[in-house]
């Protein structure tokens, strides 16, 4: 037994030494490279974002790590869900990593972002750790909402969630943009919704107010082709979501290309900051998972369709190929990042399964900022719930 343990220790020691380190050290990489990106379709705009962009080695490595982290985190959530450690609603965004990472790359940390319930990726790109996100999914005290929000209700600084009601975040986003303007801040709000929510009346009401008041609001339709199990063609009389703001200018963007998303976001944010009012972006993307964990995702589309997107337009693969072919990084170096990311996810999952759940007496915490002054029929219902942080 001891002998075996010793042998396995030696072997694992050998396995852990990154052989590629020597290679990487001796090789020189380009500091940056210029790439052609797909031209955006425009609505009510004379010109759009540039069709070439420069990617630095440093940014490329950062984007790659972030996208890979979101992908692995979602796959880990899938695994924990199947083990019944995560319960209830759970909407995964694998396939859409170029959207959350690309949008973040195009704005400042002081800008604002609000989205619907497919929010894990944005929660991460807005600055929370994988630990806090996975622990929130498993309902533990170390989660970003102390385990009470779950998959659809996570928040970070300048990130207003996760919202469980379809489309309800859009008027809220217009409100955040109103606050930016009212307070005289040079900030914008990215207001996201899906193709399923795009047919909601409240979205058109928000368009109208935002245009009337020239709010710095970037309305972003993440079009992943299916609202639950309904394809866009079956749900919308016009699937040109970028044109549906009518009097609001729009862009249709390749949402599988992080550089396309980044440039379009920079363009849209600059448009809003210049005081011209709102602008619309449609990100054409794709989700590999079903709508939620209860949806296998193959009754309304074929496995072949999913496989084709994976093999031809995967956002992570696209970035990787560009970086390797332009001498911005080596395959070995990117593999090393993959190993580090996997380890980070494993550690986070360990924490998310070992961390304690909040006790029942904390049920009423954080409902009121302090003990509420009112009584109902002569009794204070909340007396037993002390509100403490």
UniProtKB/Swiss-Prot annotation:
A Pfam family: E1_dh
Residues bearing the modification N6-succinyllysine: 62, 243, 276, 312, 384
Q: Which InterPro entries match?
A: DH_E1 (IPR001017), PDH_E1_Alpha_Subunit (IPR050642), Pyrv_DH_E1_asu_subgrp-y (IPR017597), THDP-binding (IPR029061)
- Please give the subunit comment from the record: Heterotetramer of two PDHA1 and two PDHB subunits. The heterotetramer interacts with DLAT, and is part of the multimeric pyruvate dehydrogenase complex that contains multiple copies of pyruvate dehydrogenase (E1), dihydrolipoamide acetyltransferase (DLAT, E2) and lipoamide dehydrogenase (DLD, E3). These subunits are bound to an inner core composed of about 48 DLAT and 12 PDHX molecules.
Q: What is its EC number?
A: 1.2.4.1
Can you tell me which residues bind Mg(2+)?
A: 195, 224, 226
Query: From what superkingdom does this record's organism come?
Result: Eukaryota
Task: Identify this protein by name.
Answer: Pyruvate dehydrogenase E1 component subunit alpha, somatic form, mitochondrial
**Which compartment or compartments is the protein found in?**
Mitochondrion matrix
Q: What residues bear Phosphotyrosine in this entry?
A: 300
């Amino acid at each position: 037994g001891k002998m075996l343990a010793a042998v396995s220790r030696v072997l694992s020691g050998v396995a852990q030494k990154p052989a590629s380190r020597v290679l990487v050290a001796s090789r020189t990489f380009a500091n940056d490279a210029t790439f052609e990106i797909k031209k955006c379709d425009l609505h009510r705009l004379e010109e759009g974002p540039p069709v070439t962009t420069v990617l630095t080695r440093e940014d490329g490595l950062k984007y790659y790590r972030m996208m890979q982290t979101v992908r692995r985190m979602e796959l880990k959530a899938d695994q924990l869900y199947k083990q019944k450690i995560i319960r209830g609603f759970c909407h995964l965004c694998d396939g859409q990593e170029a959207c959350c990472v690309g949008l973040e790359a195009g704005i400042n940390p002081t800008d604002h972002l609000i989205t619907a319930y497919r929010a894990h990726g944005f929660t991460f790109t807005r600055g929370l750790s994988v630990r806090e996100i996975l622990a929130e999914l498993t309902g533990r005290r170390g989660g970003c909402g102390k385990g009470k929000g779950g998959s659809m209700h996570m928040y970070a600084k300048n990130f207003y969630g996760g919202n469980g009601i379809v489309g309800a975040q859009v008027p809220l986003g217009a409100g955040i943009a109103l606050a930016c303007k009212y307070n005289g801040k040079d900030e914008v709000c990215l207001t996201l919704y899906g193709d399923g929510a795009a047919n909601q009346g409240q979205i058109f009401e928000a368009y109208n107010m935002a245009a009337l008041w020239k709010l710095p609001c970037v309305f972003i339709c993440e079009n992943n082709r299916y609202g639950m199990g309904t394809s866009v063609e079956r749900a919308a009389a016009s699937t040109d979501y970028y044109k549906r703001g009518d009097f609001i200018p729009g862009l249709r963007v390749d949402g599988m290309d992080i550089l396309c998303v980044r440039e379009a976001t920079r363009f849209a944010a600059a448009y809003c900051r210049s005081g011209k009012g709102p602008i619309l972006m449609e990100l054409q993307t794709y989700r590999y998972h079903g709508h939620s964990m209860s949806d296998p995702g193959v009754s309304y589309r074929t496995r072949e369709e999913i496989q084709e997107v994976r093999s031809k337009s995967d956002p992570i693969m696209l970035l990787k190929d560009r970086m390797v072919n332009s001498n911005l990084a080596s395959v070995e170096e990117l593999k090393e990042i993959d190993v580090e990311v996997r380890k980070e996810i494993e550690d986070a999952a360990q924490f998310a399964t070992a961390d304690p759940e909040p006790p029942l007496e904390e049920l009423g915490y954080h409902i009121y900022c302090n003990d509420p002054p009112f009584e109902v029929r002569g009794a204070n219902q909340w007396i037993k719930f002390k509100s403490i942080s």
